[in-house]
Amino acid sequence: MVKLALSAVISLMFAAAGLTTASLAHAETAAPKKAQVKKAKARHTVRLASPRVEGRVVKRISRVNGRHKVSYQRMVTAAPAFATMGDLAGLSATRDPLDLKSNVALVLDQDNSEVLFEKNSNIALPIASITKMMTGLVVVEANQDMDEMLTVTDDDVDRAKFSSSRLRVGAQLTRANMLHIALMSSENRAASALGRNYPGGKPAFVEAMNAKARELGMTDTHYVDSSGLSKMNVASARDLAKLAMAAYQQPMLRQFSTDVNAIVEANGRPMQFGTTNRLVASPDWSIGLQKTGFINEAGRCLLMQAVIEGRSVIMVFLDSKGTQSRVADAGRIRKWIEALKPAALNIGSGSAPAYSTGM
């Protein structure tokens, strides 16, 4: 009995062993297949982060050397629109029939100062780099040596608004070239160097700017620097029209402000600069003087003398919205003037302007 029982146990053990061996053999053959399936699945599976993780979103998925590569794009929240001084004064509520994007506009006949169009033209606002036109007027009337070499120093670096400049500290240019790129390209360091190299330095130069403004009857105008970077440089459109007519009498200011581009030498090395006003390069326009300007507080600004239908006019646009809006407003004014009959402008009659609105 014992032998029979022992034989039965041994038989069961071998049977179990055979089952285990078979199971192991099956497992060994099955494992590679499962691994292959998993590997195959892995090849077709792209692990992505959350659609938006820490300000990133999936930009594209590409295949590189048989592997998927995920490229992400950083999300940048748009900055809220900056309220200009004109907006804060409520000027954006002023409407006009031409739907100008500028909060302030003035157009007058250059020959007799007849106002053809005005919109908030007596409100003093920041004028940004239009300031440089007064800088130019003071420089040319001071009769300083225009061939004198001026050096850009650390004092000319903008540490308030951190505006860019192609002129490095140590760059040397003639006074004429400094004035040229200040008017044509609105080069801030050049404008600063011009003021700093005036007899008495920057304080005396700013005082000369304000003295000239008083001489021209610019009662709403005040300057604090030669570049226009400060929001404290303010003027009304009516005052700027007076400045334009005075500056127009200076051939150097007319030429430098309306050149499309120019090559100037800095430390003996040629540098090419271009205009900030694309209209001067247009064959459809005849422009004799111009200056653009922009800082956040001022919006887009434009001062310009042009001939339209044989008539010389002064245009001033302040606090315009959009990078091209000031030149677009100039185009709207031009079409409006071209569409008017000469009699409708009351040229020389001393009557009310063709259009007037605002404060």
Residue ranges and their predicted role:
Residues 218, 222, 228-359:
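Domain-terminus/edge residues, biased toward the C-terminal soluble/receptor-binding domains
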Residues 25-27, 168-169, 274, 333:
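Short, hinge-like loop/turn segments at secondary-structure boundaries
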Residues 48, 52, 61-238, 242-251, ...:
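Active-site-adjacent loops and short helices of periplasmic peptidoglycan-processing enzymes
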Residues 1-101, 339-359:
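N-terminal secretory targeting signals
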